[in-house]
């Protein structure tokens, strides 16, 4: 039995591939999170580009804390079952009048995951049409569409060949609300044309019974059990941006390099990711 979502919401997610406007976090929680992030940006400007990127949940205890908020995990469990792995956290910050945007894509295009994982967009600031909120194509979660590869943030990313944008839905969210979408849902966003930062944390949650089409994934067990051992288990961060956390993230990405964000490796290819060198 679902703990939070209604039968109507569950049905909508299954058929349309997304839910929006779920009230989860308080303004106080969001402001505290934002303050911690901006303090890090101030003290470690040279590390921001990689530390707030792939698997930042391994680096910062306050990212892990927000990502494992009980109400949020109740909602995720309603969608993917009782055994839940947090497989990635990544910041999505758009500066005022900036050019950052994301073309139409499906996160599981290069490495498919079955059963599907879900992606949670946590709106730390308001997310509006003007500041480049997330946009989704309803019903596009039913199959992987043809795609091409392009370079973004020093890695290869998939972009859908053709999209009917007339059906797109803007996922407008207030501060503290979350939007959730299936890993196969086509989504993207435009640039920020407002005077304020658009600030979000985006998390991937996978059912522990899921398997990747390529390689072996890894994640932090945040609900239930990982009894089938289909995923490598990641540690909880101890403190914020410690040397131990940085080394731990490096070990995970070297041991389990084939994840949905980094994509599959070619034969003989070595893992490549941004990191701090000691």
Label each residue range with its predicted role.
Residues 2, 18-20, 24, 119-123, ...:
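Conserved hydrophobic/aromatic beta-strand scaffold that supports enzyme active sites
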Residues 43, 185, 190-278:
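Non-heme Fe(II)/2-oxoglutarate
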Residues 1-113, 232:
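Non-heme Fe(II)-dependent double-stranded beta-helix
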Residues 129-190, 210:
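Double-stranded beta-helix
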Residues 105, 112-129, 172, 204-207:
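Short, conserved beta-strand element in jelly-roll/cupin
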Residues 106, 153-165, 197, 215-222:
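Short, surface-exposed loop/helix-turn segments at secondary-structure junctions
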Residues 26-27, 92-94, 109, 127-129, ...:
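Short, solvent-exposed loop/turn segments at secondary-structure junctions
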């Amino acid at each position: 039995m679902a703990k939070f979502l209604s039968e109507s919401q569950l049905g909508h997610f299954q058929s349309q591939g997304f839910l929006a406007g779920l009230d989860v976090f308080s303004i106080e929680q969001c402001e505290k999170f934002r303050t911690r992030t901006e303090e890090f940006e101030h003290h470690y400007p040279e590390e921001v580009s990689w530390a707030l990127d792939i698997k930042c949940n391994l680096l910062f205890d306050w990212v892990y804390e927000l990502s494992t908020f009980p109400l949020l995990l109740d909602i995720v469990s309603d969608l993917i079952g009782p055994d839940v792995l947090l497989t990635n956290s990544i910041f999505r910050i758009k500066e005022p009048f900036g050019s950052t945007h994301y073309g139409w894509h499906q996160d599981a295009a290069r490495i498919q995951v079955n059963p599907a994982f879900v992606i949670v967009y946590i709106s730390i600031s308001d997310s509006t049409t003007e500041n480049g909120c997330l946009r989704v194509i309803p019903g596009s979660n039913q199959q992987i569409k043809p795609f091409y590869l392009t370079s973004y943030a020093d890695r290869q990313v998939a972009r859908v060949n053709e999209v009917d944008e007339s059906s797109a839905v803007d996922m407008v969210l207030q501060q503290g609300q979350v939007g959730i979408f299936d890993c196969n849902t086509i989504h993207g966003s435009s640039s920020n044309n407002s005077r304020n930062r658009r600030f979000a944390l985006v998390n991937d949650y996978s059912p522990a019974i899921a398997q990747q089409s390529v390689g072996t994934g890894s994640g932090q067990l945040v609900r239930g059990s990982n009894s089938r051992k289909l995923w490598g288990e990641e540690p909880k961060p101890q403190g914020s941006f410690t040397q131990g956390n940085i080394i731990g993230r490096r070990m995970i990405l070297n041991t389990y390099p084939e994840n949905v964000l980094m994509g599959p490796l070619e034969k003989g290819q070595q893992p490549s990711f941004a990191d701090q060198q000691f």
